[in-house]
Curated annotation (Swiss-Prot):
Annotated family: Belongs to the FdhE family.
Alphabetized UniProt keyword annotations: Cytoplasm
Organism (species): Salmonella enteritidis PT4 (strain P125109)
InterPro entries from the UniProt entry: FdhE-like_sf, FdhE_C, FdhE_central, FdhE_N, Formate_DH_accessory
UniProt protein name: Protein FdhE
Main location per the UniProt record: cytoplasm
Classification lineage: Bacteria, Pseudomonadati, Pseudomonadota, Gammaproteobacteria, Enterobacterales
Membrane-spanning intervals of the chain: none
Disulphide-bonded residues: none
Compartments, as annotated in UniProt: Cytoplasm
Function: Necessary for formate dehydrogenase activity.
UniProt GO cellular component terms: cytosol
């Protein structure tokens, strides 16, 4: 199954009535995304061997929150949604969508917000980014979107991605239309932008018990049934791993068919779990999965592979 976004005026009456029964997509609601993430990162930093880095990530998330309100985005995406639907492509496809300089503004505003909080190597990194030309910034963005991580140092990547992510999330939150699930491929990628997930979450509330993958770029969530590999869609050789017990709120779902794994978070076990923060705070589980011979099928926006990884 794949997911397509249909312009509102092209939905049939039956689709309009049933669109909310099992929502294929949950577009980002940006009001509390970054503050909640920052708070969760700070909470998880306590008694965590990665505490310093989690607090560093919290500073970036807080800067995203501030810049979000300082630099709102106004854009009419109606035509783009229609064109993407006609072509069967994600409307905000990272591989073809022209990037507006708005994301440069977001990056420089984030740097200004972060500079008083940074010191040492981290301060040197953002000062270097502050001096980068528009062409250099675009080259780094293109490399990250092409998964050419060797071309962007792992200390610069989180800042570049944070600005791009905020830009894409602003656009995604403005999409006019509904989503429809249909037969197709590439369910492992975000239907809105084509990026990959950071983790998946079994939710509570109106989507109780449903699993949604969370995009590591535009913050959209899309539905994928449980007990099915989110990478290759096989279900015959799935296993679930945790560092605690069967009631753990964070597990890794591994697939013997494709040899990959993805974190799965359970809100019913801990309502405070957050897709990015809890994934980053459980890197010990990632190390265990690598020892077992599985490759990660996702990327955390605060932790990019370095050269040779």
């Amino acid at each position: 199954m794949s997911i397509r976004i249909i312009p509102q005026d092209e939905l049939g009456s039956s689709e309009k009535r049933t669109a909310d029964m099992i929502p294929p997509l949950l577009f980002p609601r940006l009001k509390n995304v970054y503050n909640r993430r920052a708070e969760r990162l700070r909470e998880l930093a306590e008694n965590n061997p990665l505490g310093d880095y989690l607090r560093f990530a919290a500073l970036i998330a807080h800067a995203q929150e501030v810049v979000l309100y300082d630099h709102p985005l106004r854009m009419d995406l109606t035509a783009r949604i229609k064109d993407a639907n006609d072509q069967g492509k994600p409307p905000l496809d990272i591989h073809v969508l022209p990037r507006d300089k708005h994301w440069h503004t977001l990056l420089h505003s984030m740097i200004a917000e972060l500079k008083p909080e940074m010191s040492g190597p981290a301060l040197a990194v953002i000062e270097n980014l502050e001096k980068a030309s528009e062409q250099e910034l675009e080259q780094m963005a293109s490399a990250l979107f092409a998964s050419d991580f060797a071309s962007v140092s792992s200390d610069k990547a989180p800042f570049i991605w944070a600005a791009l992510s905020l830009y894409w999330a602003q656009m995604a939150s403005l999409i006019p239309g509904k989503a429809r699930a249909e037969y197709g491929e590439a369910r492992q990628y975000c239907p809105v932008c084509g990026s990959m997930p950071v983790s998946s979450m079994v939710q509570i509330g109106t989507t109780q018990g449903l699993r949604y993958l969370h995009c590591n770029l535009c913050e959209t969530e899309w539905h994928v049934v449980r007990v099915k590999c989110s990478n290759c869609e096989q279900s015959r050789d799935l296993h679930y791993w945790s560092l605690e017990n069967e009631q753990a709120a964070v597990k890794a779902e591994s697939c013997g068919d494709c040899g990959t794994y993805l974190k799965i978070l359970y809100q019913e076990k801990d309502p405070k779990v957050e897709a990015v923060a809890d994934d980053l705070a459980s890197l010990v589980l990632d190390a265990r999965m690598e020892q077992e011979g599985f490759a990660r099928s996702s990327i955390n926006p605060f932790l990019f592979p370095g050269e040779g990884e």
